[in-house]
């Protein structure tokens, strides 16, 4: 593993608008996170890209900007508490399904696999609710060094696992 100081610079990416026009035409862009923390020009660009891709169905590309799962879950709890206080819902109606429906990712399937690079063995406040039954694969290489070989290795490890979705048997 190379250190960050000796790693070549990652290639520069084109702007999202250029990417959409050059191959992302079938992808739906979704950005999750707190947009209030972002510059208004960035928010405008995000919203423009999301609008342009809203009807694309080949792939959902989800980018997390200014996202924290604890903050997301706190917002869900606050919103459900407000609805309970105003009588829109009763406390007894609140269940896993209702919470899931209130998440930013409510219309996206939960991940089957999380590949974590850099050798870190943690999920770092990322999709805490959504990763409940995901398989986790930890890769020692740093993100800029992650390549097809690393990806294939992670998929191979994932395919050898017996998924139990919370069952202990």
Positions of predicted regions on the chain:
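Flexible, compositionally biased loop and terminal segments
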Residues: 1-169
């Amino acid at each position: 593993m190379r250190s960050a100081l000796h790693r070549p610079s990652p290639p520069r990416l084109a702007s999202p608008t250029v990417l959409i026009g050059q191959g992302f035409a079938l992808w739906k862009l979704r950005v999750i996170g707190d947009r209030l923390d972002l510059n208004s020009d960035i928010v405008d660009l995000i919203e423009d890209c999301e609008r342009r891709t809203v009807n694309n169905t080949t792939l959902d590309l989800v980018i997390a900007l200014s996202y924290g799962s604890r903050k997301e879950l706190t917002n869900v709890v606050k919103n459900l508490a407000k609805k309970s206080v105003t009588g829109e819902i009763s406390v007894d109606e609140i269940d896993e399904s209702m919470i899931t429906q209130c998440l930013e990712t409510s219309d996206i399937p939960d991940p089957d696999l999380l590949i974590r690079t850099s050798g870190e063995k943690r999920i770092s406040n990322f999709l805490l609710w959504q990763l409940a039954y995901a398989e986790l694969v930890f890769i020692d290489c740093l993100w800029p060094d992650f390549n097809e070989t690393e990806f294939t290795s992670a998929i191979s490890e994932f395919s050898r696992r017996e998924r139990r979705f919370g069952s202990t048997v």
